Amino acid sequence: VLKGASSVLYGSSALNGLIHVKTKRPGLDPVTQVNVQGGLYGKPRQDGTPLYGGLDLSHSRRIKNFDLTVGANTFLDDGYRQDNYNRRVRVGGNLTYHDPRVQGLNYGVNVNYLYNDYTGFFIWRSPEEPYIQSPLANMGRRENTFYIDPFLNYTNSEKGTTHRFKGRFFHRGSRIITHTTDKSLFDITNNMGFDISSVPEIINMAQNWQTELLPTFLPYLPEVMNGKVSGLMGELGKLGNHFFPTATSADYMDLISWVMGRTPLPDKNNVGAWLVDAMKPMEKKAPEATDHTYSYNLDYQFSKKFEHSQLTVGGTYERIHADSKVTGQHSSDNVATFLQYDHKFIDRLNVSVGVRLEYYRVDDFYREAETKIFGAKVPVKPVFRGGLNYELGEYSFIRASFGQGYRYPSVTEKFILKDIGGVGAFPNAELKAEQGYNAELGFKQGYKFGNLKGFVDVAGFYTRYKDMIEFRFGLFNNKTFDYIDGLSKLFNAFSSGDGLGIGAQFTNVGRAEIYGVDLSTSGVYEFNRDTRLAYTLGYVYTNPIDMDVDSRNAEEEANDDLMAMRSKSNDSKYLKYRQKHSVKGVFDLEWKQFNIGTNMSWKSKTLAVDYFMVDERTKAEPNLMDYMRSMLFGNLHDYWAENNKGYFVMDMRVGMKVTKNIHVQGLVNNLLNKRYSARPMDVGAPRTFILQVGANF
């Protein structure tokens, strides 16, 4: 675990730290591990009891000069929410050959395959049915991912040098799975209180709207032009109640989803024929075309150890090619070279400095970044980083780091239509690179009082961004992927036949700064040789600031378009989907072969969310967006106001070593069965019961 942005060896985008995972070499004796788990949700959605479970298998051994590791994993989760499932199978392995002819030389290959069939959950049906997905959220995904990583390592211990070569070929085939509501028109309209004898009246209104509807709604046009829509919406409500007297907003969404599944819509002359044809059973839709993503990667690293220092240089190249039936073919190239120098002074001070040069292009745009060097513009971005660690005394350390970051938008973010939580994840070809820097100052102190020992760590951090990348949720043109932020774009999507989609898109939000404090302590108390208590406590304070909030609020306030979108749910200075305070605690008590433990966490309220979901501003009367939200999400405004007040979640576990090699553990997640949400319409899992059995032999 590397905190802060002090290293250039792991890419230019890791500003807040990273975790480098290394595979353990097999021991002299073969080892097989089997872990089985199964669980059920205590009080989930009402249609049955969804289960989940998984199986992990791994085997490692040495065969003469070969290291062999193979593994398999399967996971099935019905989901505690309707149409929110995950079915995953993974197999992989590692083969390493230690060449006996050359000391310090090893080479081999890692191979991995993943099948993943899943749907997310982003929009609920209503606050009264929070575990049932909206019929508008009808997208899932089926993926097949394969990669093969050849590698070669050579270490000359006499010269203190190491060469590392790594390569990767990666392929992912990804297909959007589209679902439509399985409710019949009869079931939908029956729930809405519809009388079948009203069909001729509806057909007459559709065919003669100039005389049947226009006289009712036209008088409200002056009010609408002045931004007042309550009168018009009142008349629309009366019309809806006339035909659907018992309908809820969720029922209207069922009806809209049913109609959207039977496009193209009729014109005024064939409403009756379209309705008769629409009543017939739908033919099963053909699967969406498969999108393919290919990646080729080559990385080289050379390091030289000196008496008190180490020099590391290297380079990396990655090419990504994406082939989508919707958005076409796109490719990117990323070339980087880096240098890092680490030095240890007077046995107490460790210093690390480095520089990384990045070149990135997408398609034929060869200058995603430009930097002036001696007056000339070159298409590379330099990233400088450095850090130090000083031992103040016994078990007492102070550290500091500073690093620049630069994250290029991926081909997927710019050009590929995907999905998130059952709704569209729309590409944004205008997305720019995010850049910034991070500074951190930390202090770590070990302690020992009798049988208690551990450490306490406190750090302050500051991060500054330019063109920060965040996602926004809203309406989009289904063909051009334009964000709908005005009536003209809305009408254009309808008139052109492009249609509307609901979902999210990555976008640049401007300047931002995030600063705060991270305080934690971990330790263990030994009661006796059979009993010990291990613990971890942590608190994080974060202040996420939108530095352009004043100018953005003024610009949005001046926009009087009825469909004008705002950047977030309130006028505060805070970034979206962040909490200021979070506290966690982990305790594990072991006694002989038994153990009992708990995880506890508390988070404060979410500071701001997307405007398309909630508007927390006070106003004299509802605007058009308020009515639209009520139709799409039910009374989400009041639900969020009542429930966005921070939450506490507690998990418990009890385990036992049955034998030296077999361990059984029972867990209860969300022990208090707390209903909580970190964002609107995302209700956390209810109380969950899990049984795990692990065996090593």
Language model: regions and residue ranges:
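Gram-negative outer-membrane beta-barrel transporters
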Residues: 35, 346-347, 460-464, 483-612
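Membrane-embedded beta-barrel scaffold of Gram-negative outer-membrane proteins
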Residues: 164-168, 172-178, 391, 397-401, ...
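N-terminal periplasmic accessory domains that precede
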Residues: 1-2, 14-36, 55-57
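Flexible loop and strand-edge segments within Gram-negative outer membrane beta-barrel domains
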Residues: 77-88, 98, 102-159, 163, ...
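Surface-exposed extracellular loop regions of Gram-negative outer-membrane beta-barrel proteins
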Residues: 58-94, 118-125, 174-179, 305-320, ...
